C-alpha cells in the first residue's frame, strides 16, 4: 500500500486554502481536499492546471470537521493509502512539518503534532480550555497528551472501524478515546506553527458550544471507565 496522503478539511477558507494546498503539493504529497459545504465550491477556486495531485471531495452541506476527515480517510483508503496526515485549512499548520510526523510514525498509531504554547508569539486563547481538554484526554486514554486540540495529526485508515458517534470538533477528541479503547497507541511529536493574525484567520470553533460538546464526550464515556482507571491510578499502571 502507499504510505501517506494529506487531508485538508475546509469550510469557508477561501483566502487561505489555495496557499495551504500548494504548500502541501510543493512538499511532495498528494492532497485530498475535503470541501465541507463551503459557500463557494472549493474546486472552482483552482484553475485546471492547478489541480494535479489534488483529489477533491465535496459535501453539499456542512457536516462538521469530523465527517470531513472521515470522508478524506475513505478517499485515501480507496487510493490505497495506509494512513493520512490531516492539517487545517486556515494556514496555521506548515506542510514542511509533516515530515517530522511521518519520520516518527509507527504503523497503527495516532500521532499528534503538538504545539508549544510557551512561546511568546502564541496567542493566549483559552488556557483553561486547553488544560481541561488535555487533562481529560490523558485520563480517558491513558496516554500523556499535551495538545489534545491539535488538528495536525496522522491517522491510520483503521479509524474507519471505530464506533465514533460525533461529527464536528468533538470528533477529534472522541477518535483519541475510541482508538485507545481499541488497544492502539497515541503519540506526540513537537511541531512549529504559523499563527495568522485575527484578520487572516477564519476559525469555526465556537468556544462555548464546541467546548461543551467536547466535555459531553467525556461525560458519556467516563462512567464506564472509572473503576478500571481508578485502579490503574492507584497501582501506578500505564496503558502500553
Please annotate each region the language model reported.
Residues 1, 15, 142, 164-240:
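Hydrophobic helical membrane-anchoring modules
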Residues 2-4, 24-33, 53-54:
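Short loop->beta transition adjacent to catalytic acidic/histidine clusters or analogous donor-positioning motifs
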Residues 11-26:
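Short, well-formed alpha-helical segments that are part of the catalytic scaffolds
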Residues 13-16, 38, 65:
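Donor nucleotide-sugar binding loop of glycosyltransferases
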Residues 21, 29-38, 57-59, 87:
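Short beta-strand/loop segment that forms part of the nucleotide-sugar
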Residues 35-44, 91:
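A conserved acidic beta->alpha catalytic loop
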Residues 55, 61-63, 67-78, 95-169, ...:
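Acceptor/aglycone-binding surface of glycosyltransferases and processive sugar-polymer synthases
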Residues 81-92:
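Short beta-strand-to-loop acidic/aromatic patch adjacent to the donor-nucleotide binding site
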